[in-house]
Amino acid sequence: MTQHEDNALKLLSILLLVLLPLSAQALQRGDRLAPWTLLDQYDQPYTLNDQAQTLLVARSMDAAKLLKTALEGKPKGFLEARHTVFVADIQKMPLIIATMFAIPKMRDYSYRVILDRESRVVPQYPGDEDKILWLQLRDGKVVDQQQFGDAQALRSALEKPQM
């Protein structure tokens, strides 16, 4: 092997190692979601399991507001009755704001908010910063995914019977 071929092989190896993590983030139909445990707004633990049929993911406050708007007027337990879990990444929120204002306010919501306080879980799932990622699950595996940037469209999707 020549020096040029050896350098090209090393470069290719490094390139593959750099790009491999990027491709691992894209979820494909049939991928099993790794279980995780986070606390909700009441400091109660929730572990993602095979009972969840829909996972809603918010990467920002704007995305979380979409869900809040979509659920206006819905009864307490609406998401749970649909085996739907909502996880919000709040790592970017200053701790004092989260602790003193945001999380106490979330306790008045009619739905459970699983809080990703350290961005441990949400970054595993692809999606736009300002949209809600919807992962449709069956037995812990992804069967469909879509994003919502409109509260009314999200509300309509949530109102449809789940399969």
Spans of model-derived segments:
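Structural microenvironment flanking redox-active thiols in thiol-disulfide oxidoreductases
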Residues: 63-105
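A short beta-strand-turn-helix
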Residues: 35-52
